[in-house]
Amino acid sequence: MLNDREKILTALREKPLKIYEVMKRANLPNEEACQSLLMKMRDEGSVKFDIHKGRWHIGD
């Protein structure tokens, strides 16, 4: 079974997504937990946030 980090990375492989799209594709019911995890992953460099488009994508 995939953990939440793997689910998020799998969801973002196709294209950059907004927070609600990430939650829907990764099947995460709690917005706050999802956003908190995305922020941790951003700090680690695994994902990035485009402030102009409001979308998350896999870090380079």
Short names for language-model regions:
Residues M1-L9, E31:
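Short, leucine-enriched amphipathic alpha-helices that occur as contiguous helical runs
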Residues R25, S36, G54-R55:
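Residue-level "edge-of-site" marker
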Residues A11-K15:
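Short helix-to-turn junction characteristic of helix-turn-helix DNA-binding domains
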Residues P29-K40:
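Short amphipathic alpha-helical interaction segments
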Residues L17-A26:
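Short acidic, hydrophobic short linear motifs in intrinsically disordered regions
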Residues L2, F49-D60:
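Short, cationic-aromatic polyanion-contact patches
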Residues G45:
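Glycine-centered, phosphate/nucleic-acid-interacting loop/turn motifs that mediate DNA/RNA or nucleotide
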